[in-house]
């Protein structure tokens, strides 16, 4: 019997495929049964209502996209009243993504969202820390450590720390999150990028800059997922540019115990369901008994020792 | 003001199925210099549409055209009996240029039907459509629906020039009173449009007004709606990524109860209350 | 008369198109007259002979490539004996790219390469600093400042500092380089990435990881070029993913005074010559009199104030 | 050892022009299950080739196949009189699959001719070619050249099975003594090959040996070359980005004067001295 399950701390997922925050919502239930997924991950919410960034909020770049949605949020109360009950009908665990501009606000939101129906909290620490210089918490080990420590005190639920690629210290940040008590890492959020319309000479995003996601981003996020898996003992959830079942397999081989699918769902809304089938087929034909056997099976030999922590391109 | 606002406020998630299917191209031909008509061989399942709804098209990728995101396109016609789905589109950039390369027999993947369409309330007898350019694409199925429901229809069709006016015959066949206006003949200005509509209101009366796109027309109809207490709806556009409500990129601002609220064009729209809409 | 020239410190280039280091060599002269280019930029050299990284040294990722060539080098003496004389036959200025593992070695190489025939020195500070923790000099403002200060003392030639995208401190690093005396910034080198062959489960590069270049990288490098142009007064040379004349225009609008073309030359070896023609056509049809008028003409309004220094994806 | 090493050491940059041209496809057809023959309508300028040289092909991009880098391909035939350039290729991955989609009349951009080809020194009368599989592609133009120069040619062609053996007739037409060996008939093993070659050496003698690719064959010929003091050349492969010498990704290691040196396959190769080559 093929075993598709994967373990993320205390949580067992029936398969390693789940959506990425901000690229999934209740509406997708109009396309397929959401209970086929390993977990459900909601768009990041904030405590207060927020309207998000100016439009245009997305633009296309060669084979990928940029977004500057920001975090429009109906607020905590609306979320508890409408969203959590919606997902109650499913067996798949609900992962709630949260964000705030300071460690204290972060911690109090974390506490208040630790309610029945929520299986784990994903902390989007890739958002700017307004108390410091506006750099995201996850850009530095110190701020990562500080915020995760507070969050750890605020909840008994599993805490997933979502990292940012906008740093030169991926492994240090990963270790700081682990040390401060994160139960898993999500690697990663989008990479800061820009596009300009050469006809109007205006930035293509209302917000000037935005995050790169989609296929172009894959080799970068895969590298980060690999680095993190090599440097921490907590599970790593891969995220970035995953568009095909081959991409899923690549991340699992690199060491991710599960993956999140973002932009690909915009292009092919059934893709997550198809990936689950595709993964099953792959494992069967390759003679694997379980997803676990595939995870971290990269044949990196000696190379890994010297190179894992290399963070300069050669 | 006592115009009854139409129920365009966020409705609880409706779990109508949405389909993502590959359809064979029956025809894809120029309609005039700027527009093309795409006819797909579509399964019955996706043809349960409401006028004003749209599909999200996965445009083909080739050596020279590599659109990545899908492209939203209003339903120009849906014909369950013939199994046909029609789009009328203007070639503007990479995605629509890629659409234009499709030939008979090739396939195109379409997601839909999507969004909230137009309403024709039971007591709306005299309907006014005001369309400009490719806006006709969006309003055409509404005209057919009105015809089926036996409503009286006036269609004001505006365009740059005579030969840019499409589908006039189609509207006439549906029994509409068609009023063509063009920039060339100097008849398409707002002043003239206002005079024509006010005459119509004075003559038979108008129960509801429908339009899409143009800012100038939106403002005119909002003003007329307020003055004469006539409800209306408008179909709006915004750039889309997911097309089904997940990404929140397609928001536009609306006036509602003295506040400005953001709504998703793909989900709460693309059809919105005329008075709540804000031009851009 | 259309003015294609661009000014980089004391150097006037006849047009803003030049190759990127490591993607250009004498052999390209077999395809077109290299004197059409604004400048010639050599592959990074080191003082000693080096053989570079294990193969495979390149691999393909969706619409782009990774490389881990490393810095194979015939050494300083061979370079002076063979390469500099070769480029002497051209009017286009010769820019020599150098690298070393410590500030002292860097400075002494810089001094020894300051010879007739060399118009400027590009310092590849995206290479690992072996004295520190192996992170590239250009990953931190402090190490950037230290190395550029020494280099500045070592030569009278113009110094171009080539930055790395593997940092969360792009603008700080840019300012450090400026403060320490760099005459221009090249933005940027490749971004650390990875790919795994799912059939063999081996990394696709012999070196495990490598640098992403090509179209997928463009929105990231463009964002960096924009951030740098907004935060320093020295000229910025854009580099990253430029494949078409539209890309050249986008970088110039963003604030780059010139651009370097890398990977695109591998796909279309005549591309630089074509871009010069294309730029000329664009400027003429758009009614510009000079390249200068286009540089930095991005219509970023108020947005730029708040956003330039944002280094977290929204 | 007194084998004269061939001049494969780095030569000063030769400034022979290299062309990047778009050619129309004349034919692109399967040769047997695994191989395809691509015939291009090529301008005279790019047909001044040396056997063993290669072109760098810009494979077509489609919805499903999106190769990015170019793909190196040996010249299988160059015919200035007919204006034709031939490639014989095996469909292995994305690039070659994309090549296989080309149909007559479509165009393909090719960069070349590139690299250093085979040498046939004036005093080499009896030549031995040993090829396996697609290696024939690389050696075929060498056979033609040998024929034109009036040299005696022995061609040992090895393959998995009878039907994988290509171009035997072509080699025979060129007057070669063709010796087919297959895994199926158990004749392709190294031992048998050695016996055949040694018999040939004893009989007419061999002045030079040429091969490509296979490790087993390389080792065999190196050993025979040393024993019998026969020079030889081998065409090697390595992944390429630029194809013209700029990127240094295509290096392989060679023994030279007691040291191991890296050489660029695209530039110092793809043809190298047989004894200097290192298998992998
Ligand atoms: C609900 C809806 C219905 C539509 N119906 C029609 C129709 O029936 N006929 C028709 O010709 N056009 C229609 N449009 C507009 C159509 O979607 C755009 O013309 C098309 O997306 C342009 O893509 P492009 O790649 O050719 O142009 P580009 O300008 O290259 O597109 C770049 C990006 O901007 C987006 N974009 C550009 N213009 C628009 C626009 N007006 N609205 C939304 N996104 C845009 C594209 O989707 C793409 O993501 C509709 C738009 C919406 C939102
Ligand atoms: C000088 C030279 C001459 C060649 N001549 C021929 C020929 O005449 N006929 C023929 O069938 N093949 C030939 N090859 C091999 C051919 O280049 C590869 O089969 C082809 O590149 C595979 O590309 P792909 O995308 O189909 O395969 P993939 O495996 O998907 O390729 C992935 C990457 O690896 C590279 N690659 C894969 N295999 C090879 C290889 N053997 N050599 C170099 N790069 C490789 C590709 O170029 C590409 O960059 C030659 C190679 C070289 C270097
Ligand atoms: C439109 C959009 C909105 C997003 N919103 C969020 C968000 O609210 N919170 C978050 O942590 N990540 C958000 N992300 C990032 C994704 O969760 C994911 O990390 C990223 O897109 C990389 O994965 P992908 O390449 O598969 O899309 C968003 C991404 C996109 C494209
Ligand atoms: C094969 C290869 C070799 C490179 N070698 C060097 C180098 O030696 N020194 C350097 O500073 N940058 C080197 N680079 C980086 C390029 O100069 C350039 O910064 C990068 O590729 C981004 O530009 P592109 O996307 O146009 O290729 C190399 C890039 C490639 C692809
Ligand atoms: S397009 Fe994604 S929410 Fe509307
Ligand atoms: S392929 Fe670039 S040097 Fe050989």
Model-derived regions, located:
Chain B
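Short, basic/aromatic-enriched C-terminal tail that caps enzymatic domains
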Residues: 19, 262-280
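FNR/FR-type flavoprotein reductase catalytic core
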Residues: 94-241
């Amino acid at each position: 019997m093929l075993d598709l399950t994967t373990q993320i701390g205390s949580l067992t997922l029936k398969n390693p495929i789940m959506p990425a925050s901000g690229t999934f919502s209740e509406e997708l239930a109009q396309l397929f049964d959401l209970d086929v997924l390993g977990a459900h991950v909601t768009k990041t919410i904030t405590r207060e209502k927020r309207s998000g960034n100016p439009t245009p909020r997305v633009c296309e770049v060669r084979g990928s996209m940029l977004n500057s949605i920001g975090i429009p949020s109906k607020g905590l109360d609306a979320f508890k009243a409408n969203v959590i009950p919606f997902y109650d009908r499913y067996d798949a665990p609900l992962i709630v993504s949260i964000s705030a501009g300071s460690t204290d606000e972060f911690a109090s939101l974390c506490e208040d969202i630790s309610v029945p129906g929520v299986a784990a909290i994903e902390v989007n620490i890739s958002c700017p820390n307004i108390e410091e210089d506006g750099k995201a918490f996850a850009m530095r080990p110190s701020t990562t450590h500080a915020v995760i420590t507070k969050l750890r005190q605020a909840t008994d639920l599993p805490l997933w720390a979502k990292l940012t690629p906008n740093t030169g210290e991926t492994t240090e940040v990963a270790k700081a999150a682990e040390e401060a008590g994160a139960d898993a890492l999500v690697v990663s959020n989008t990479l800061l990028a820009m596009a300009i319309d050469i006809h109007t000479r205006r930035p293509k995003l209302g917000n000037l800059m935005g995050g790169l996601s989609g296929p172009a981003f894959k080799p970068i996020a895969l590298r980060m997922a690999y680095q993190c898996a090599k440097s921490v003992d907590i599970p790593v959830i891969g995220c970035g540019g995953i568009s095909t079942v081959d991409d899923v397999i690549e991340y699992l081989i690199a060491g991710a115990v599960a993956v999140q699918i973002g932009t690909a769902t915009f292009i092919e809304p059934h893709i997550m369901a198809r990936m689950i089938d595709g993964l099953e087929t792959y494992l069967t034909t390759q003679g694997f008994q379980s997803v676990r056997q595939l995870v971290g099976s990269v044949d990196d030999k000696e190379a890994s020792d010297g190179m894992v922590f290399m963070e300069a391109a050669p | 003001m006592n115009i009854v606002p139409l129920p365009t406020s966020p409705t609880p998630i409706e779990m109508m199925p949405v389909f993502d299917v590959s359809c064979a191209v029956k025809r894809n031909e120029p309609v005039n210099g700027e527009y093309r008509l795409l006819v797909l061989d579509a399964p019955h399942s996706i043809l349960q549409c409401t006028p004003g709804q749209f599909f999200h098209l996965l445009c083909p990728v080739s050596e020279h055209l590599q659109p990545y995101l899908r492209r939203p396109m209003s339903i120009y016609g849906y014909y369950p009996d013939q199994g046909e789905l029609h789009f009328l589109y203007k070639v503007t950039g990479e995605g629509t240029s890629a659409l234009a390369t499709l030939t008979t027999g090739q396939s195109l993947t379409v997601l839909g039907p999507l969004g909230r369409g137009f309403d024709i309330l039971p007591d709306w007898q005299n309907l006014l459509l005001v369309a400009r350019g490719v806006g006709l694409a969006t309003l055409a199925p509404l005209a057919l629906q009105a015809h089926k429901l036996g409503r009286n229809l006036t269609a004001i069709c505006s365009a740059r020039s005579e030969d840019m006016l499409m589908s006039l015959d189609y509207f006439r066949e549906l029994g509409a009173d068609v009023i063509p206006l063009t920039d060339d003949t100097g008849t398409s200005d707002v002043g003239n449009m206002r005079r024509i509509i006010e005459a119509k209101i004075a003559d038979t009366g108008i129960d509801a007004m429908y339009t899409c796109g143009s800012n100038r027309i939106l403002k005119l109809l909002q003003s007329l709606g307020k003055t004469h207490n006539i409800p209306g709806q408008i179909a709006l556009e915004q750039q889309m990524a997911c097309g089904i409500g997940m990404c929140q990129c397609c928001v536009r601002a609306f006036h509602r109860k003295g506040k400005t609220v953001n709504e998703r064009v793909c989900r709460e729209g693309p059809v919105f209350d005329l008075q709540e809409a804000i031009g851009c």
